[in-house]
Amino acid sequence: MKRSLQALYCQLLSFLLTLALTEALVFAAQEPSPRESLQVSPSGTIPGTMVTASLSSTRHSSMVATPASVVTPTPHPDGPSSQATAPMATTTPHLDGHPPTNTISTIMATASTPHSEGSLSTGPLPAAMATTSSHSEGRAPGETAPTILLTKPGEATSRPPTAPSRATIRRPPRPPGSSRKGAGSSPRPIPAAPSGHAGRKDGQRGRNQSSTHLGQKRPLGKIFQIYKGNFTGSVEPDPSTFTPRNPLWGYSSSPQPQTVAATSAPSRTSWVPPTTPLVPVEDKPSLSRADQGGGSTFTSQGGEPDATAASGTPASQQRAPVPSQRPHGDPQDGSSHSDSWLTVTPGTSRPPSTNSGVFAATTGPIQAAFDASVSVPSEGLPQGTSLAPQAPAHPTWASESTVSQAEEKAVATPTPTMMGRVPSPLSTVVSTATGNFLNRLVPAGTWKPGTAGNISHVAEGDKPQQRATICLSKMDIAWVILAISVPISSCSVLLTVCCLRRKKKPANPENSLSYWNNAITMDYFSKHAVELPREIQSLETSEDQLSEPRSPANGDYRDTGMVLVNPFCQETLFVGNDQVSEI
């Protein structure tokens, strides 16, 4: 009985273990992969800031957002853009069979995913980052592409400027997917040799202009700078007025850039350590905290040494003259494309100034939730949910003076996505609602152009298009069936045996051997009586035979006439005169 119970318990345990393993396998197969996991960027740390840059018809750019700001996409004309949602470094594939010539150098690396026409890029990364721009259809691989840089200040903006010491400058860790030739501990990037004669001229022009703006003071605050291509104009919102004072790039007295980086070759990326000692970057491979502030990244197209600089915490009033280094490689960029810096100061609630090709948004303490559903631009036409009036792009041949005038004459036309704080200037296309810039939970590889991002459901994001399916082979199915059926059958058999053993039959005397022996004996003696002696001797005869022994000495009862009864024998031997009994 004990053995049967032990066997039953063992079978039950094996059955339970098998079920548990099967469920674990099923759940593991149903869990989404890391690529489908949603990336949530922190919010609420600083006032939301939105930056939108309008591009020409042959240029692509990727917009970035602050750690707590709204993701700002850039309308791309008929071409794929990059989408950064996962911490990984990849290069953007090119159209028309162009070999990849750009390299990404990021701290929070960006994952670039090609999309169809009208797609846009979002940057929902917790750290300041920039994504690469992909070539358009009619673009040569060696042509310069916009470079975007974003830096989050690490301390309060009201801190008095102090000159950073070189000893406190720390080198940011190398991104996993970028091969770089570091510029050492120097706060100045190493530009590559210009590929053409126009590149040298552009570089000299940038240096000359950078030296003309010495002594200018930049407003303190959290400033996010984005510049791409050539520098033809600049924007800088003033704390006291709504119009910029003078061109922004080339300031030598502006706050020290937090990260100075440049690309020097089509297949390599130069990285320069940050020059701001306020928030040193920890040499961690992940750098998951956006509060460290030293994680500004940049990307640039190959074949052009784009020098990027972003101002983080205003550590000093001196800016490294990195922006003066103009990108080289495309002689037509200096004349056909008008690019400039972008300065966003979220600490103030005044309308921003704008420049050609760049939109500077000063959003101020914008609410955390933007109640607007944004649609994706189709065929490069930025569309907002409110269809805000879009001013024509500033002509590419405009000079700095015209840009400055256009900036001063900018007319504010608020859009619902910016809570009525962002104007629509005359010199740039203001479509801050273009694309799904508020949807920060778009998994990599699952973004579809044309799907609108609902801001009220930020926690949900777009549902993954690829659902996990369980593929079970015949052997797997057989094992599952066996794992379920065998324990049940064995348990049923054991229970049946136990029940049969417990049901004992009533005791039957006929089954015992002793019963039969006793029965035979009693039955025989009941049927057969003991036969008495045949003749009764008289006393005379007995007295006459007194001298004779009653029993023979040798046990011979042949002539005595006595009957020997053996109750355990099958036959009774009657001793008579003519019968001899031998026991």
Swiss-Prot record:
UniProt main location, coarse: membrane
Keywords: Cell projection, Endosome, Glycoprotein, Membrane, Synapse, Transmembrane, Transmembrane helix
Location in or out of the cell: Membrane; Postsynaptic density; Endosome membrane; Cell projection, Axon
Residue ranges of the region described as Disordered: 71-360, 376-404
Pfam families: TMEM108
Positions with biased composition (Low complexity): 177-187
Region described as Interacts with DST (isoform 1): 180-413
A GO cellular component entry from the record: postsynaptic density
Biased composition (Polar residues): 80-93, 100-122, 251-273, 310-319, 333-357
Modification comment: Glycosylated.
Positions of transmembrane segments: 7-27, 477-497
Top-level taxon: Eukaryota
Topology relative to the membrane: Multi-pass membrane protein
Gene Ontology process terms (BP): cellular response to brain-derived neurotrophic factor stimulus; dendrite extension; dentate gyrus development; modulation of excitatory postsynaptic potential; neuron projection development; positive regulation of neurotrophin TRK receptor signaling pathway; postsynaptic density organization; receptor-mediated endocytosis
Described function: Transmembrane protein required for proper cognitive functions. Involved in the development of dentate gyrus (DG) neuron circuitry, is necessary for AMPA receptors surface expression and proper excitatory postsynaptic currents of DG granule neurons. Regulates the organization and stability of the microtubule network of sensory neurons to allow axonal transport. Through the interaction with DST, mediates the docking of the dynein/dynactin motor complex to vesicle cargos for retrograde axonal transport. In hippocampal neurons, required for BDNF-dependent dendrite outgrowth.
Subunit description: Interacts with DST (isoform 1). Interacts with SH3GL2. Interacts (via N-terminus) with CYFIP1 and CYFIP2; the interactions associate TMEM108 with the WAVE1 complex.
Protein name, as recorded: Transmembrane protein 108
Gene that this polypeptide is encoded by: TMEM108
